[in-house]
Curated annotation (Swiss-Prot):
Keyword field contains Cytoplasm: yes
Entries under NCBIfam families matching the protein: PRK04231.1
Identification of the protein by name: Large ribosomal subunit protein uL3
Function field: The L3 protein is a component of the large subunit of cytoplasmic ribosomes.
Chief location category: cytoplasm
One GO cellular component term: cytosolic large ribosomal subunit
Molecular function GO labels: RNA binding; structural constituent of ribosome
One Gene Ontology biological process: translation
Similarity field: Belongs to the universal ribosomal protein uL3 family.
Entries under PROSITE patterns matching the protein: RIBOSOMAL_L3
Highest classification ranks of the organism: Eukaryota, Sar, Alveolata, Ciliophora, Intramacronucleata
Species per Swiss-Prot/TrEMBL record: Tetrahymena thermophila
Keyword entries, A-Z: Cytoplasm, Ribonucleoprotein, Ribosomal protein
Cellular localisation: Cytoplasm
Residue stretches of biased makeup (Basic and acidic residues): 1-10
Length: 391
């Protein structure tokens, strides 16, 4: 009989504590890439909504790789990114205790769906948010505040909100977040932020193909889970008294308390997580009917698969396609940020050459890429049906 091992590395990382539900549904972006004054002023983050996953076929162009000049199939995630609206500017002063906000400048008009974010129940509220601001708005006072930011501040950020009315989701309240302006001098940053007030910003003005980005979001909620699923500890033998899906020993006699490092049952999922260095494979236009076409597949087809993305629907706006998976379930709002750690390895610098994007149905085993291809296979003629209905 072989001997048993009496030592093993601990199960469950201590770097992700406490494992409880996050207070923020949207990914919080509390740090931004390092500023480079030599570049032009630009925004560093955006928001998107997870639509679903599919797969692509591409040719690897990375010398030294064993897959170089070969075709590979990779999983990708499609994130719908409707345009965001800039409604404010915030200036920060760098103090010994960190950044401190000097003042906030709001645009003249604020969308009602944005005002709803300041109330728990918009229908039963007095709806007085920003009424005094809009009634007594003064352009000269706004310019004075912007000059004050230009004089005293070292960090400039804009206040942006999503446009939920452009999405087919139940959520109607717009998500609000701050986006840092990097590049140029402070005066150029303030002028750039002022030029964006009350205007829509599209995702292709911030991110580009072959770029690396970070994804900040909240994971899927799993509810109350035991130690086997929550920490991955090994279950006990089958003859163990009073259950075997548990921890055999929760600690010594003394100290006479349970340490925080001991795996215990509790909340699993709905945690805030940051995934770094995701490769952008495509930045697509929502109004382009052939935004899923490639050089190797010239078929006119959209990124939405047949039948729509499961539990999401049709992608009608601009979108970003990134390599691999990302946090959260379908419809979860994600914060996309420019990579905070510059990457210089071969995979980061590789130019992506897509040959094929799969748009078959994700409900079951899809075999057709377009509706026309499916109709041709089954011998259907949709023109006759349309003529019959018109008669």
């Amino acid at each position: 009989m072989s001997h048993r091992k009496f030592e093993a590395p601990r199960h469950g990382s201590l770097g992700f504590r406490p494992r409880r539900r996050t207070r923020h549904h949207r990914g919080r972006c509390r740090s931004f890439p390092k500023d480079d004054p030599s570049k032009k002023p630009h925004l560093t983050a955006f928001t998107g909504f997870k639509a679903g996953m599919t797969h692509i076929l591409r040719e690897v162009d990375r010398s030294g790789s064993r897959h170089n000049k070969k075709e590979v199939v990779e999983a990708v995630t499609v994130i719908e990114c409707p345009p965001m609206t800039i409604v404010g500017v915030v200036g920060y002063i760098d103090t010994p205790r960190g950044l401190r906000a000097l003042t906030t400048v709001w645009a003249k008009t604020i969308d009602n769906n944005t005002k709803k974010r300041f109330y728990k129940n918009w229908a039963n509220s007095n709806k007085k948010a920003f009424t005094h601001h809009e009634k007594n708005f003064d352009q000269k006072a706004q310019d004075l505040l912007l000059k004050r930011i230009e004089k005293y501040c070292s960090v400039v950020r804009v206040i942006a909100h999503t446009n939920m009315s452009k999405l087919n989701l139940r959520q109607k309240k717009n998500h609000i977040l701050e986006i840092q302006v990097n590049g140029g001098k402070v005066a150029e940053k303030v002028a750039f932020a002022k030029s964006l007030l009350e205007k829509e910003v599209k995702v292709d003005s911030i991110f580009a193909e072959n770029e690396m980005l970070d994804v900040l979001g909240v994971t899927k909620g799993k509810g109350f889970a035991g130690v086997i699923k929550r920490f991955g500890v090994k279950h006990l033998q089958k003859k163990t008294h009073r259950g075997y899906r548990k921890v055999g020993c929760i600690g010594a006699w003394h100290p006479s308390r349970i340490r925080f490092t001991v795996p215990r049952a509790g909340q699993l999922g709905y945690h805030h997580r940051t995934e770094t260095n995701k490769k952008v494979y495509r930045v697509g236009k929502g109004d382009d009917a052939s935004n899923a076409s490639t050089a190797g597949d010239v078929t006119d087809k959209a990124i939405t698969p047949l039948g729509g993305f499961p539990h999401y629907g049709v992608v009608k706006n601009d979108f970003i396609m990134i390599k691999g998976c990302c946090v959260g379930p379908k419809k979860r709002v994600l914060t996309l940020r420019k990579s905070i750690i510059p990457q210089t390895h071969g995979a980061a610098k590789e130019i992506i050459n897509l040959k094929f994007i799969d748009t078959s149905s994700k409900i079951g085993h899809g075999r057709f890429q377009t509706v026309e291809e499916k109709d041709k296979f089954f011998g259907r003629d949709r023109t006759k049906k349309v003529e019959a209905k018109s008669e």
